[in-house]
């Protein structure tokens, strides 16, 4: 079992899953990794993003990633597809640039010092995961935004939960906290 990251498949008349060209296009730059690799990817993105996020929409991106916690939801039960992130058309260009900075920060091991007591991510695997994630992020366009994703995601949260109650951070890892706490602490 593992996790595949790509552009998700909306189906519908314009892009039926049975259409081989549609399938090939959307899987062109897909990234497959074992469950442990997905957990490491989320952890290092959360560590980097926790230090880089400034705007509300950037912080929302980090809370969304922190919610992709396989320890809490089960192996393989995370959604890391690029177009599933809570994109906001009004901030798309700056949020995409932010996510590319988060990836670069993870490459530079931003925040990894907080992992010393737990583990040291495998540099070779991390490079492969970050390179693949960057390719997918670079492919993301405003046209790929699913307008309902942000609204549905926000509506799913209660007023006393992140991201609606603000953006609390873990005092140990400086990562944004999701519903189930710090992704890095609980992984």
Question: Which stretches of residues belong to each language-model region?
Answer:
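Short Cys/His-rich metal-coordination motifs, predominantly Zn2+-binding knuckles/fingers
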Residues: 173, 185
């Amino acid at each position: 079992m593992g996790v595949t990251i790509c552009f998700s498949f909306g189906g519908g008349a314009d892009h039926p899953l049975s259409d081989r060209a549609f399938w090939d296009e959307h899987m062109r730059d897909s990234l497959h990794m074992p469950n442990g690799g997905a957990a490491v990817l989320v952890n290092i993105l959360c560590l980097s993003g926790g230090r880089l996020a400034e705007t509300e929409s950037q912080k929302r991106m980090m809370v969304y990633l922190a919610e992709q916690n396989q320890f809490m939801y089960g192996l393989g039960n995370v959604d890391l597809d690029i177009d599933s992130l809570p994109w906001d058309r009004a901030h798309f260009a700056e949020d995409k640039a932010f996510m590319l900075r988060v990836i670069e920060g993870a490459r530079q091991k931003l925040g990894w010092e907080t992992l010393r007591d737990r583990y040291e991510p495998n540099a070779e695997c991390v490079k492969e995961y970050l390179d693949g994630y960057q390719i997918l992020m670079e492919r993301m366009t405003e046209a790929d935004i699913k307008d309902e994703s942000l609204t549905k995601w926000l509506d799913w949260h209660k007023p006393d939960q992140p991201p609606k109650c603000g953006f609390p951070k873990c005092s140990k890892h400086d990562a944004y906290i999701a519903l189930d706490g710090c992704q890095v602490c609980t992984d």
